[in-house]
Amino acid sequence: MLEKQPDIDAVALCMPPQHRYQAAHAALTAGKHVFMEKPPGATLSEVADLEKLAQAKGVTLFASWHSRHAPAVQVMKAFLARHAPTRVEVIWKEDVRHWHPGQEWIWEAGGLGVFDPGINALSIVTEILPNAMFLKSGVLEFPANRDAPIAADLHFTDATGLAAHAAFDWRQTGKQSWEINVTTDAGELRMADGGAKLWIAGVAQELPEEGEYPSLYRHFASLVNSGRSDVDLSPLRHVADAFMLGKRKEVDAFES
């Protein structure tokens, strides 16, 4: 594509993370701005290398997190800047057969498994919390015939003693659950539908109408126009921590 259309200014990469590095490296080397869909790569190190290359070439690299652009996210962030959170509960459960039918790459090493949706929740939590959190313990459930987990149960904290828990599961049928609940001294924040709905102290909030992807591309254009990059790897770092610190539990084989 780069050879056939040398006049393009930017590319957006949405292929599986195991194959992202080569495409991004080629585009950056050719002097193109690069928008990477989440997750930005299969490893932290390869994305860090791409960030250095973008800086050397003077082009923009945007490691995007689409869920951070959900309508409720900035409202929650502003509220938590004023009212310290004491507890966070994340429930991110969906049906993998519905959302990823026949996609074998997602079960391979580097495909993230249940962390493919779970990283969306982590991208929101790392955006809204006033302090950085870190993993304390976790259990990752691997089907006997797969190299990536189908479920994860994670416990986090931060320097203030925050209690944060996340439950990810790819086996939920029927209604899907993309929820984050945050306890504060001014009431509970309850986010639902991946950030499309929000209640504060039981009161439904009016939220911006702009969708995630129009907001994402507007931000990308702003980065390009101002000569900046945006490469926040904190959600991916939490996933790496989970694989490093979490206990592995083998469960029944899973066929998609």
Description of each model-found segment:
Residues 144-149, 160-224, 228-233:
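NAD(P)-dinucleotide binding in Rossmann-like oxidoreductases
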Residues 1-35, 39-51:
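Beta-loop-alpha module in the N-terminal Rossmann-like domain of NAD(P)-dependent dehydrogenases
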Residues 9-13, 159, 219-256:
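C-terminal helix-rich "cap/oligomerization" subdomain common to oxidoreductases
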Residues 101-174, 234-238:
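Rossmann-like dinucleotide-binding domain that binds NAD(P)(H)
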Residues 18, 41-99:
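A contiguous active-site-proximal alpha/beta segment in oxidoreductase catalytic domains
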Residues 36-37, 61-63, 191:
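Hydrophobic residues in well-ordered beta-strands that form the structural core
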Residues 20, 24, 47, 73, ...:
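A general structural signal for well-ordered alpha-helical segments in protein cores
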